[in-house]
From Swiss-Prot:
Family: Belongs to the major facilitator superfamily.
Record-given protein name: Maltose permease
Domain of life: Bacteria
Keyword Signal among UniProt keywords: no
Gene it is expressed from: malA
Record topological domains on the Cytoplasmic side: 1-11, 75-78, 127-137, 184-213, 263-272, 319-330, 383-394
PANTHER family, alphabetized: BLL5896 PROTEIN, NUCLEOSIDE PERMEASE NUPG-RELATED
Gene Ontology MF term list: cytidine transmembrane transporter activity; symporter activity; uridine transmembrane transporter activity
């Protein structure tokens, strides 16, 4: 028992934080600069970039529920995570060699199918670890924000001074290192394989609070994740350099860390829905400011508010989705939550953003983001009202 506790403490202090740092370092190395790469190096049109950047959310929407169901069915989430990491790294290297629009499309689909498993499986493992050993999920997840922030700065500088293709090699190297570390992630006893039934999944989807959370996730996280595709173009259009893009992402992602660490304490004090409302209102204000064609210095200054919006929204929404689900379908619930926000919402916002960018300017993209987020605030208000009603009935 003592040995198990020591291993749990060691995993919480070193293995999980380093693992999150590596996987988000990989994402930060590739995705913020990918749209700029497709524009500057591949010479693709705005509509073509919009289509390619909308593919990962489409694939995520289809693949993530399958990964989550597979994890609940096989009871082997670490093995599935390891396979996804290695294959995503392989497709990342192949992406660097692509030279045509069709090849970009094929590799984007393959890469996205593997990459879509990484975060929900990692989150399920981390949440299970915190449940078993104690601790703070936000304190683990903040290392992902730090990894993302360091990657966009370091890889942005390297792509400016060496070669743009370095974004793909940095992505793959970080994922392979994370795969090696994944073999040390703790494995906890789980139910027998095959215990998950269709009735379990139907019961989850029949929950109205869970459905409302999915709608709010679509409207809140769709713009947040689509921003990763268009934020570099916004700064580039305002006169920023690749290193400047890296600095902006550094400020934005780095500001998330303290809020993620404080998320559990704030949840206990204010409640999950109130924190999500605060995050949504801050995001809406930020998108409206970007739609107004602000000066570059203003964009750099306002990136730090991402900590109060995204830094609170990610751990709060994830834990809320898990709380609403029965234990036997929690991996599926996390995967569905991720598929709707990271998949459907991001796809919709990225695709519409591409057409708005082609027809008008980047400001129209951020005006659309603000409208989506404001509608998301209304859904969260409905969810808050339902929670109050349920509390009064009890």
């Amino acid at each position: 028992m003592g040995a198990a506790f020591k291993w749990g403490a060691a995993a919480r202090k070193t293995v999980f934080p380093l693992f999150y740092f590596l996987i988000f370092f990989a994402f930060g190395a590739l995705f913020p600069l990918l749209s700029v790469y497709l524009q500057e190096e591949a010479r693709l049109s705005g509509a073509a970039i919009g289509w390619i950047m909308s593919l990962p959310p489409i694939v995520t929407m289809a693949a993530q529920p399958l990964w989550g169901t597979a994890a609940d069915y096989t009871r082997k989430p670490v093995g599935l995570l390891l396979a996804a990491l290695v294959l995503a790294a392989l497709f990342g290297v192949m992406y660097a060699l692509a030279g045509s629009y069709r090849l970009f499309v094929v590799l984007t689909v393959l890469l996205s199918a593997m990459q879509s498993a990484i975060v929900p499986l990692s989150d399920s493992l981390a949440l299970r670890h915190v449940h078993e050993q104690g601790g703070n999920y936000g304190a683990i997840r903040l290392w992902g924000s730090l990894g993302f922030a360091m990657a966009v700065l370091a890889v942005g500088w390297l792509s400016d001074h060496i070669a743009f293709a370095v974004i793909f090699y940095a992505f793959s190297l970080a994922l392979l290192t994370a795969a090696a570390l994944a073999t040390r992630l703790p494995r906890y006893p789980m139910g027998a394989p095959g215990a998950l039934t269709r009735q379990d999944v139907r019961g989850l989807l029949a929950s109205r609070p869970f459905r409302l959370l999915l709608v709010a996730t679509f409207l809140l996280f769709g713009p947040i994740l689509a921003n990763n595709s268009y934020f570099g173009l916004l700064i580039h259009e305002l006169g920023g350099t690749l290193t400047g893009i890296g600095l902006a992402f550094l400020f934005a992602a780095g500001s998330e860390a303290p809020f993620m660490k404080a998320a559990d304490r704030l949840i206990g004090r204010f409640g999950m829905v109130r924190l999500l409302l605060l995050a949504a209102l801050i995001s809406a204000a930020r998108w409206l400011a970007y739609a107004a064609d602000p000066p570059l210095w203003f964009v750099y200054m306002t990136t730090v508010v991402q900590g109060c919006s995204v830094g609170l929204a990610i751990p709060t929404a994830l834990q809320y989705a898990r709380r609403l689900a029965p234990e036997r379908v929690q991996s599926t619930a996390v995967a569905l939550y991720s598929a709707v926000g990271n998949g459907l919402g991001a796809w919709f916002c990225t695709l519409v953003g591409g057409y708005l960018l082609e027809r008008w300017q980047i400001g129209a993209v951020y005006l659309f983001f603000s409208i989506c987020t404001i509608v998301g605030v209304l859904v969260l208000l409905l969810l808050a009202k339902r929670e109050r009603t349920a509390g009064e009935e009890k």
